[in-house]
């Protein structure tokens, strides 16, 4: 009957990709609710087993703005920032302490300390997070009504430690909780009171193995000439939901999805 779903972006992922990185500016890329959360819309569509009827949304870019820059903070971290010791986003520490991570590969293709530091001096990833040209939100919520009367509440926020998805499905006979980061699914039966925990053993990289799984499935479909479990129309529906959520955020109104789709053909 009800879905509660949260996209925990992670403070470090937000800073890297959506404040300093390629997806920081909605005019140059797309709204964050589309680029980061169309997958979440897809998950909720599949679980609700129904098309979206209408939705509302609220969100803001509240923290990563010029107004919140500490006094004396320069445009680039390496220009003598007086707040480097207490700033979670100080670029040299942010990237140099994670030279083996994938984030630093976006800074430069030569990931030794010398080249990373050089790239941070005047490159986009060396900018103060409060002095960037970012326009996408750092938190947004969406309330969804499906055609079969299932309702869903979705939250996307930058202000978390982990980058993860957590979901709760509330039904008439029990509830299910899913934790992508922990790799667990909990099933509670209302009648017996029994709790079943399922542990999922998935790879830590590539979106928990889903990137490779999609490619394997695509190759099999091409090689065997068969159809996939879903078609492009389902992906279009989830993208429409994300775009309609952005429209609802901007206008402050409840958006009917079919009407929105017809108006934007």
Map each language-model feature to its residues.
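Generic structural "secondary-structure junction" signal
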Residues: 20, 25, 35-36, 131-132, ...
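Predominantly a Rossmann-like dinucleotide-binding segment in NAD(P)-dependent oxidoreductases
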Residues: 1-127, 252
């Amino acid at each position: 009957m009800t879905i509660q779903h949260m996209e925990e972006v992670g403070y470090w992922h937000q800073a890297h990709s959506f404040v300093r990185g390629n997806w920081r500016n909605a005019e140059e890329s797309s709204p964050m609710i589309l680029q980061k959360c169309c997958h979440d819309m897809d998950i909720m569509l599949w679980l609700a087993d129904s098309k979206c009827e209408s939705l509302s949304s609220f969100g803001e870019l509240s923290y990563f703005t010029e107004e919140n820059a500490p006094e004396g903070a320069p445009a680039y971290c390496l220009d003598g920032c007086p707040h480097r010791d207490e700033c979670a986003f100080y670029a040299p520490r942010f990237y140099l302490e994670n030279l083996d991570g994938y984030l630093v590969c976006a800074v430069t293709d030569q990931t030794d300390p010398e080249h990373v530091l050089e790239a941070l001096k005047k490159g986009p990833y060396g900018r103060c997070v409060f002095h960037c040209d970012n326009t996408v939100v750092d938190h947004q919520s969406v309330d969804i009504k499906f055609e079969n009367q299932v309702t869903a509440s979705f939250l996307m926020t930058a202000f978390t430690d982990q980058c993860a998805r957590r979901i709760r499905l509330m039904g008439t006979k029990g509830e299910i909780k899913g934790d992508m980061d922990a790799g667990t699914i909990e099933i509670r039966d209302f009648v017996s009171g029994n709790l079943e925990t399922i542990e999922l053993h998935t790879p830590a990289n590539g979106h928990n193995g889903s990137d490779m799984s999609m490619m394997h499935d695509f190759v099999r479909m091409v090689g065997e000439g068969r159809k996939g479990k879903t078609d492009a129309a389902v992906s279009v529906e989830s993208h429409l939901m994300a775009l309609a959520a952005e429209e609802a955020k901007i206008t402050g109104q409840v958006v009917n999805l079919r009407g929105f789709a017809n108006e934007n053909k």
